[in-house]
Amino acid sequence: MQNIKVLIVDDSAFIRKMLRDLLEIDSSIQVVAAVKNGKEAIEYIQSNPVDVITLDVEMPVMDGIETLKEIMRVKPTPVVMLSSLTKEGAEMTFKALDLGAVNFLAKPTNIFKISSSTDIQDNIIDKVKEASHLFNIYFYFKSDMIEEIK
């Protein structure tokens, strides 16, 4: 079985590093790149294969919602949104789910809690694996439906 190739998109270098470290605990996940904004993410996916994207909701240059729209337009890919636990962040996360994101995570805020909690680590890993699997099922059935229509 091939590794799940993950692109991390977050304006915080700290969060990018933390997510990389957490995801790479699982040998079936390979973080292929970590970029700081949506513009860099779009450029990356146009020339590099990615199975799952973790995407921050609030970023400069191109926010998570605009980035998600562009991802779904140019190269539909399963996206797990990361959001802070603010009201605005929650609203944007629900909008992202409507636009095609497959899941969301509350953005980790306490590195000491994260590094000592296997529940949080497992949750992040599980959501990335689920995103990859669910998206593959979606496209499998979508292609079958298109064939039936023809």
Where are these regions (language model features)?
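Strand-loop microenvironment adjacent to phosphate/nucleotide-handling motifs in alpha/beta enzyme folds
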Residues: 1-150
